[in-house]
Amino acid sequence: MTKKAKNVEKVPFEDAMKRLEEIIDLMNQPTTSLEASLALYEEADQLMRICESRIQEVEARIKQLSDQRSES
């Protein structure tokens, strides 16, 4: 895993979402080059995977807590 990828994994969920919005804005600018767009796309892909993983972790934890409450 690259250094950049490791740094992306440490980004808080809210910051990752904010960065994804920034990437969308940058990619929609006509001055963004093809190469820059590709790099932004790759960064966005990493951020989306991390966000999806964190959402799944939270959903699993909520289900676990709900199940525990139901058993009580």
From Swiss-Prot:
One GO MF term attached to the UniProt entry: exodeoxyribonuclease VII activity
Alphabetic keyword roster: Cytoplasm, Exonuclease, Hydrolase, Nuclease
Compartments (UniProt record): Cytoplasm
Entry-linked HAMAP family: Exonuc_7_S
Role description: Bidirectionally degrades single-stranded DNA into large acid-insoluble oligonucleotides, which are then degraded further into small acid-soluble oligonucleotides.
Assembly description: Heterooligomer composed of large and small subunits.
Stored Gene3D superfamilies: Exonuclease VII, small subunit
PANTHER family in the cross-refs: EXODEOXYRIBONUCLEASE 7 SMALL SUBUNIT
Designated name of the protein: Exodeoxyribonuclease 7 small subunit
NCBIfam families xref list: PRK00977.1-4 (NF002140), xseB (TIGR01280)
EC number(s) given by UniProt: 3.1.11.6
Swiss-Prot/TrEMBL GO biological process terms: DNA catabolic process
Record's GO cellular component terms: cytosol; exodeoxyribonuclease VII complex
Organism classification: Bacteria, Pseudomonadati, Chlamydiota, Chlamydiia, Chlamydiales
Known catalytic reactions: Exonucleolytic cleavage in either 5'- to 3'- or 3'- to 5'-direction to yield nucleoside 5'-phosphates
Family under the similarity heading: Belongs to the XseB family.
Pfam families registered for this protein in UniProt: Exonuc_VII_S
Superkingdom in the source lineage: Bacteria
